[in-house]
Amino acid sequence: MSGQSPVNPARKLHDADVVYLYDGSFEGFLCCVFESFAQHELPFAIWTPERETATLYPVKEIPTDHAKARRVFASFRAKLGEETESLVTRDFLSGWEDKELRLIRFLHLAFALGSGTVKRRGHPEVAPLYQMKQSLDWEVDKFQGFVRFQEHDGMLGAVIHPKNYILPLLRGHFCARFPEENFLIYDVVHQAVLLYQNHKAQLLELAEPLTLPPPDEKEQQFQELWRQFYKTLEIKARRNEKGRMTHCPKRFWADMTEMKEELK
């Protein structure tokens, strides 16, 4: 394929009884895209090592090749436009189990029909991408308001349990919000940390779970003050449990200082 575009939809696409296995990185996913277009096949499934399970289908390991990944990524903007490039890149952060297959199906359609494909929101191969984006945007909006920090030896630390991998999307907000602080946000679900220290931010993948130290006495006092403040704001006669659940779903409560006690 040295003299060809990395994505060439000219030949007829076929469903293949094969499972792609890749390393879970975005570059690795781009190599899955390359393989799918090179073989003109839609795999039965696309797995990462964490999602690998027993199957009767042959498993094809897709190694991460940085040169191939760059070629595929460059073709997104060159042939499909910036909007498609942004949507695919953002949706890769989704927590949907079949996100890779959804994205590849869309890309085959987009390269066949052109840059306007992303506008066809009602198309069955396009609609799921906007559903993934909506889920991402909703979680980002919620966590921008629901992240609760505790001080640990001069550093602020927070724990979150998002369904989607949203740390890259939270980075700009919290770095701008606390430019002079050192802080970390620990994503338990995806075993990753957003670390901001000495005015520099980095995303770290963890090899094993992280345990934050317990808050000291001063921090515990501040937390108790915050809980008391939250309680004094409530007007019991106007309590609307359904409305509260809508604006602050229960799955967020375990990581929120003022809500933890209500889970007991």
Task: Describe each PLM feature range.
Residues P63-V72, K200-L212:
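Acidic, Ser/Thr-rich peripheral helices and adjacent loops at domain boundaries
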Residues E180-N182, A192-N198, L210-K264:
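Long, compositionally biased intrinsically disordered terminal regions
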Residues G28-Q39, R105-A112, G172-A176, E224-K231:
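Short, hydrophobic/amphipathic alpha-helical patches that form generic packing surfaces
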Residues L87-D91, V188, R239-M245:
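Short coil/turn segments at secondary-structure boundaries
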Residues G116-L206:
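Internal, well-folded beta-alpha domain core
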Residues S2-H66:
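N-terminal ordered "arm"
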Residues V18-S25, K60, P124, M155-I166, ...:
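Conserved aromatic-histidine-acidic binding/catalytic patches
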